[in-house]
Amino acid sequence: MTKRTLGGTSRKRKRVSGFRVRMRSHTGRRVIRTRRKRGRSRLAV
């Protein structure tokens, strides 16, 4: 039997694309800025 590989882990998602991770780098801050400008309700995961 094969493993379910499509589940997704919330901890991993946060570590890769959470708000605090975005704020660490210049490009991440640019992502947040762009999403704010577009009026996104969710800026990061």
Curated annotation (Swiss-Prot):
Residues 10-45 have a biased composition (Basic residues). InterPro entries: Ribosomal_bL34, Ribosomal_bL34_CS. GO terms for biological process: translation. GO terms for cellular component: ribonucleoprotein complex; ribosome. The keyword Ribosomal protein applies. Residues 1-45 are annotated as: Disordered. Keywords: Ribonucleoprotein, Ribosomal protein. PROSITE patterns: RIBOSOMAL_L34 (PS00784). One of its GO terms (molecular function) is structural constituent of ribosome. Belongs to the bacterial ribosomal protein bL34 family. This is Large ribosomal subunit protein bL34. It comes from Synechococcus sp. (strain WH7803).
